[in-house]
Amino acid sequence: MRICFVVIKNLSKLIKAKGLSTSVGDEGGFAPMISSNNQALDLIVSAIKKSGFINGKDVSICLDVAANELYKKSKYSIHSKSYISVDKSIKEYKKIIKKYKIKSIEDPFAENDWLAWNKLMKSIKKVQIVGDDLYLSLIHI
């Protein structure tokens, strides 16, 4: 708990130093207006370092993508308003996993996109994949 508190406190300071809002979203996470996912992850990594910890050793970054909100006509909007294919999405996840030492990804694809889940599970082995919406929304399974 102490580690989380210190990292979150430093993350708040870094966000404020950039002149961004430290307002929080529905689930308690910061929701600054930033230009990219990488910018958000860079801020988190900086906060981890500023707190005296090592990303991937002392602290693990986990993502809750909530991909149901990013899904339209078998494509995903991961970076912007443009949509990319499942294969390109998986490539992006792999880049992010490597660069930021991601340990877990929750809801990386829409709950009904079985092909995407299957492809991801076959191609990413060392990261925990969590299907929150997949299981909680599909109670008939």
Task: Identify the residue ranges that each predicted region occupies.
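Metal-dependent enolase-superfamily TIM-barrel catalytic cores that perform enediolate-based chemistry
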Residues: M1-V127, L134-L136
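Conserved small/polar residues in nucleotide/adenosyl-binding loops
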Residues: I139-I141
